[in-house]
């Protein structure tokens, strides 16, 4: 089955202004995805790693991409196709609590 990488963006304000019952249903969707084999995690502090021309590693604290909302979490999910992946993540906490979820097809290298 195809795999998809999801990146959830959201913040505390959006989470708190969402009704508790909607948040609970969204957390239940996370549980369903875990039962289906998804790897789900909350984002920690990001670092940027560079090694131009393999001549030396440089590490910078903080994310490379700047967005209106912080990255809240990541998941790798199984879905039949992109439409199925979208349907699944449309019910997770970041999507429901005024955030956004990006869905990226995972193209496995051979």
Show where each model-derived region lies:
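Conserved, structured core segments of small domains
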Residues: 1-110
